[in-house]
């Protein structure tokens, strides 16, 4: 699973996923990409599931770029613990994805294969996504 090697603070503040993405909203590496149509927190397990779905559909051909990384630690208090007594322990890691962010890019396979691989990856994510081709993103 993806997670940072080390962080400055163990329990960070929540980061909002409202609004549009400021950076990484154009295709840079691949020919096809998966773009977020809404904002959300994407967990490291969801990113890994999408990556596996893409590489299996592509039969290990081509190249995949993952442009999101789970930097944000989500905390959780144990079951049946009363309110208060500080913030909970880090539980999982999430990537903050805003609308318009390019999450995955693919290169080196046919258009039909790329679209099917990205469609399957989109089913693993908790948000609406759009498949775009280089030069057609906007």
Swiss-Prot record:
One biological process term in Gene Ontology: translation
PROSITE patterns given in the database record: RIBOSOMAL_L16_1 (PS00586), RIBOSOMAL_L16_2 (PS00701)
InterPro entries: Ribosomal_uL16, Ribosomal_uL16_bact-type, Ribosomal_uL16_CS, Ribosomal_uL16_dom, Ribosomal_uL16_sf
GO CC terms of this entry: cytosolic large ribosomal subunit
Superkingdom of this protein's organism: Bacteria
Keywords assigned by UniProt, alphabetized: Ribonucleoprotein, Ribosomal protein, RNA-binding, rRNA-binding, tRNA-binding
GO MF annotation list: rRNA binding; structural constituent of ribosome; tRNA binding
HAMAP family in alphabetical order: Ribosomal_uL16
Subunit structure of this chain's protein: Part of the 50S ribosomal subunit.
Purpose of the protein: Binds 23S rRNA and is also seen to make contacts with the A and possibly P site tRNAs.
Protein family according to the UniProt entry: Belongs to the universal ribosomal protein uL16 family.
Protein name: Large ribosomal subunit protein uL16
Gene name of this polypeptide: rplP
């Amino acid at each position: 699973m993806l997670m940072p090697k080390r962080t400055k603070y163990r329990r960070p503040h929540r980061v909002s996923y409202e609004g549009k993405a400021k950076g990484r909203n154009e295709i840079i590496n691949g020919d096809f990409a998966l773009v977020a149509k809404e904002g959300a927190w994407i967990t490291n397990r969801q990113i890994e599931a999408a990556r596996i779905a893409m590489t299996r559909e592509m039969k290990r051909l081509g190249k995949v770029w993952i442009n999101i990384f789970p930097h944000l630690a989500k905390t959780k208090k144990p079951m049946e613990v009363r309110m208060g007594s500080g913030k909970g322990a880090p539980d999982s890691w999430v990537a903050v994805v805003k609308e318009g962010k390019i999450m995955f890019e693919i290169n080196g396979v046919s258009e039909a294969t790329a679209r099917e691989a990205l469609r399957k990856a989109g089913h693993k994510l908790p948000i609406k996504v759009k498949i775009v081709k280089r030069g057609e993103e906007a």
